[in-house]
C-alpha cells in the first residue's frame, strides 16, 4: 500500500493500493503489446503491397517480402514510441523500442511458422472464420511467439 498526500498544501491523504498500480501497469502492457503487433502487421501488409519486390521466404509464404518486413519494423517502432508518450511512460523509451523490435522479429517468425504448419497440413487458408483478414490464424500468428515474451517480460521487468 502506498500512502502520501494528494495535495500537500491541504494535507489530503491518499491511498493507492498495489493492486491498482499493478492493474494499471498490466493494462498499459497489454495495450502496448497489441498496438505494437497490430502496427507491425498493418505496416508490413501495406508496405509489402506497395513496395514489395524481394521475397522473404518464397517456399513457405510467397506473399511476404523483405520490404514488408522493413515496413512492419518501422510501424512497430512508431507504435512503441507513441505508446510510450501517450499512455505508458513507465516503460523507458529505449526499452520500448528494443521490445518492439524483438516483437516484430518474433511476429515474422511466428507468421512464417504458422504458414509452414498450414502448408504441412495442406490447409492453405482458413478465411471463412474471419473473412477479409486471411483467416483467424493469420490474425493470431504474430502472437505465437510474442505471448511467451509478454509473460516473461511482465514477470521480470517490474521485479
Regions found by a protein language model. Name each.
Residues 1-80, 85-146:
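Interhelical loop and helix-boundary elements at the membrane-water interface
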Residues 152-159:
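Juxtamembrane boundary at the C-terminal end of a transmembrane helix
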Amino acid at each position: 500500500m502506498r500512502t502520501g498526500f494528494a495535495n500537500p498544501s491541504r494535507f489530503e491523504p491518499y491511498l493507492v493500493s498495489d493492486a491498482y498500480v499493478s492493474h494499471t501497469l498490466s493494462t498499459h502492457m497489454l495495450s502496448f503489446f497489441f498496438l505494437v503487433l497490430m502496427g507491425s502487421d498493418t505496416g508490413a501488409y501495406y508496405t509489402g503491397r506497395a513496395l514489395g519486390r524481394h521475397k522473404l521466404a518464397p517456399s513457405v509464404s510467397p506473399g511476404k517480402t523483405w520490404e514488408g518486413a522493413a515496413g512492419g519494423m518501422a510501424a512497430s517502432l512508431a507504435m512503441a514510441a507513441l505508446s510510450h508518450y501517450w499512455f505508458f511512460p513507465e516503460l523507458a523509451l529505449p526499452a520500448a523500442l528494443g521490445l518492439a523490435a524483438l516483437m516484430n522479429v518474433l511476429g515474422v517468425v511466428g507468421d512464417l511458422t504458422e504458414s509452414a504448419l498450414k502448408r504441412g497440413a495442406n490447409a492453405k487458408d482458413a478465411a471463412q472464420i474471419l473473412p477479409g483478414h486471411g483467416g483467424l490464424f493469420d490474425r493470431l500468428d504474430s502472437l505465437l511467439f510474442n505471448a511467451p515474451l509478454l509473460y516473461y517480460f511482465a514477470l521480470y521487468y517490474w521485479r
